[in-house]
A protein has these predicted regions:
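A short, solvent-exposed beta-strand micro-motif common in secreted/extracellular proteins
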Residues: 24-37
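Conserved positions within compact, well-structured domain cores
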Residues: 15-18, 59-259
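Extracellular beta-sheet/turn segments enriched in Thr/Pro/Gly and aliphatic residues
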Residues: 45-65
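Short acidic/polar inter-strand loop motif in beta-rich domains
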Residues: 35-45
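Tryptophan-paired
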Residues: 1-27
Length: 259
């Protein structure tokens, strides 16, 4: 069954294995399609320019079809299929390490921080990246940024699809995911976190294989903190001219969306 979230009149005959649905949209509109199979839910987020055919994936916690691994800058990353989205299981660890006291610059070299200025921290948790550096100094959503060729940084809306796909109570398209500056959802965070490595009983179930780690952060003053307690993930979407959306997890079941 397909769930239509638009404002145009929609045909009721959508509870079929294949369906053709016509409605008006403007070029540049981002459309969210939600598919259901038994108790499973899957979503596709796209900005179509012509008629499109969408295939919903209901398998999860398996390597992405045809791309089980990605080799990039001397490292091998594993992929994970979570319904209709394909993610890297490991945090990116690419670029040249700079001290926490320094800021990256737009110099055609990817620069990262490693927690406590220890290279082993980047090996374990991935690099810590300032937003502009991660985006490679563009604000365009869907950009490759520091990702491998053919991959892109997830937008705020793509994060919402992931959150709804893995939460047991608030599903894709629920207004719950538009809430900011507070805990959201029911158990999305625990389902995305690793089963070990989090302090204060913060370990997750890793139910979908996302393998979120508590890599900590580097703040504006260059101070490192919260490794083992917090995990932070950027979205490639600006909140305003000074901030961007991000997700972070602590020892709770739900996720915080803030900037």
């Amino acid at each position: 069954m397909l769930k239509y979230l638009g404002t145009e009149d929609s045909s009721p005959q959508l509870k079929v294995t294949k369906a053709i649905q016509s409605f008006l949209f403007s070029l540049g509109d981002e459309l969210l399609y939600i598919g259901y199979y038994d108790t499973l839910q899957s979503g596709v987020l796209n900005t179509p320019e012509t008629s499109e055919t969408y295939t919903f994936q209901f398998t999860t916690n398996i390597p992405c079809p045809g791309t089980p691994t990605v080799e990039y800058e001397g490292q091998v990353y594993n992929t994970i299929q979570i319904f209709s989205q394909c993610w890297l299981k490991e945090n990116l660890n690419v670029g040249m390490m700079i001290p926490g006291s320094e800021w990256p610059t737009d110099n055609d070299t990817i620069e990262k921080n490693c927690y406590d200025n220890e290279p082993d921290s980047c090996t374990k948790y991935g690099g810590l990246y300032q937003w502009d550096e991660m985006m490679q100094y563009t604000t365009q959503q869907g950009t490759q940024g520091i990702c491998p060729p053919g991959w892109h940084l997830p937008s705020d809306e793509e994060w919402k699809v992931l959150e709804g796909a893995v939460d047991s109570q608030y599903r894709i398209g629920d207004p719950e995911w538009d809430i900011s500056l507070n805990y959201r959802g029911f158990d999305a965070a625990t389902n995305l976190k690793t089963t070990s490595g989090w302090y204060q009983n913060g370990n997750g179930t890793n139910l979908y294989g996302f393998s979120g780690l508590p890599g900590g952060s580097r703040d504006l003053s260059g101070y490192f903190g919260y490794v083992g307690y917090y995990g932070y993930w950027w979205a490639a979407t600006e909140y305003d001219s000074d901030d961007a959306w991000r997700r972070h997890r602590y020892g709770a079941l739900s996720l915080i969306r803030n900037q």
